[in-house]
Regions:
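A structural signal for conserved, well-ordered secondary-structure elements
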Residues: 1-191
Length: 191
C-alpha cells in the first residue's frame, strides 16, 4: 500500500512558498557575491547586480509559466526556479569571462561597450547551441509527458524550457546591455 497526499493546507503551502523564496534569495545573494569577487577587475559588483536583475527576469518567466499552466507551486516549482538560476548564471558567467579575457587582450584600446559587444558576439554561438540542445531535450520530455499523462514531468519540463529560452536572451542581451548602460551612466556622472 502506498500512501500519497496531494492536498496541502493553506498554512503548509504558505510555509513552503516562504521557504522557497528564502532559498531563491539566498542563491541570488551567493551569485552576486561570486560574480563580484570573480570579476572584480572589470567592475564585478555592477556586473553581478545586472546578472541578478537578469536572473530575476528569468525567474518571473518560470513563475509566469507556472501561473499560466495553473500548476501548483510545489517541489517542481522550486526545482525549476533553482535549475534556471544555475543554467542562466552559467551562460552569464561565460559571457563575463569572455569580457574579462578580452579586456586583458585589448586593454584600454576598446571602450567598454565595444568590449562587451565583441565578447557577446564571441560567446553567443556557444550559448545558443547549448540552450537549443537542452531545450530540445526538454521539448521531448514535454511531448512524452503529455502522451503518457505524466503531469508532474510536464509541470517541471515546460516551465524549465521557457526559463531557459529567457535565460539565453537575458545572458546575452539584458545583463550585458544593462552593465554597459550602468557603466556609461556612472562614467558620465564622474565627468
Amino acid at each position: 500500500a502506498q500512501l500519497s497526499l496531494s492536498n496541502v493546507s493553506d498554512e503548509m503551502g504558505t510555509k513552503f512558498l516562504q521557504k522557497s523564496l528564502v532559498a531563491v534569495v539566498f542563491a541570488l545573494v551567493l551569485i552576486l557575491a561570486y560574480i563580484a569577487y570573480r570579476f572584480k577587475n572589470i567592475g564585478g559588483l555592477t556586473g553581478g547586480m545586472m546578472a541578478v536583475l537578469a536572473l530575476l527576469n528569468d525567474l518571473m518567466v518560470v513563475f509566469g509559466t507556472f501561473v499560466l499552466l495553473r500548476a501548483p507551486l510545489d517541489g517542481n516549482f522550486i526545482a525549476a526556479m533553482l535549475t534556471i538560476l544555475g543554467y542562466s548564471i552559467n551562460d552569464t558567467v561565460v559571457v563575463y569571462d569572455r569580457i574579462r579575457e578580452n579586456r586583458g587582450l585589448l586593454g584600454k584600446k576598446a571602450s567598454f561597450e565595444e568590449l562587451v559587444n565583441h565578447s557577446v558576439n564571441q560567446s553567443a554561438r556557444r550559448t545558443i547551441i547549448t540552450t537549443v540542445t537542452t531545450v530540445m531535450a526538454l521539448g521531448v520530455m514535454c511531448i512524452v509527458s503529455k502522451l503518457y499523462g505524466l503531469d508532474s514531468i510536464f509541470t517541471f519540463a515546460f516551465p524549465l524550457m521557457m526559463g531557459m529560452l529567457s535565460g539565453v536572451y537575458t545572458s546575452l542581451c539584458v545583463s550585458t546591455s544593462a552593465w554597459v548602460a550602468w557603466s556609461e551612466r556612472k562614467n558620465a556622472k564622474k565627468n
